[in-house]
């Protein structure tokens, strides 16, 4: 579904990604983990068209999207949920969700998508007329994901969804991410909370200093002593 081939990206004159390659099959939940500054967010931003690669290729469903614009990429079914949520705090939950449906012109599908996200996040249904800025951090993260779903994407790019959340809220958000994937949405999950990300994902890529250093089935990598020591708090 998505193939990234030898991707190189710079910020000004500083190279951030050094020829990374990764792929997602349709229906997969794939984790991309690594320390701060490893290049994880840059990877998502380049897939979504916010950043530009100076070499390499991004192919989605057989189409080269390396130089495609953000609007074009969204219309193709790839939506990014950025780090920090970036909701409209003075608007209601319902208004935020409606804004997320701007690519969906069919009013009936909009209603179906609204019903779907309200079922996935019941707390949003209960508070749909509440302003988004009054929600807790975890509830705002749920809203950010729900807003992305209003466009009925085939692939979600999730950037640090657990950032700043309590353990309980983190669990609820990850449960929702797993449920979304179970319903068929392909997900690339960038996350510093390596244990939780690997626990719900099919496969994991590990990134260090703009390079993919390891990849494989999440269940197998979680048993690797070196990875347990470096990322999972193991002995």
Predicted segment positions?
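Glycine-rich phosphate-binding loops of nucleotide-dependent enzymes
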Residues: 1-235
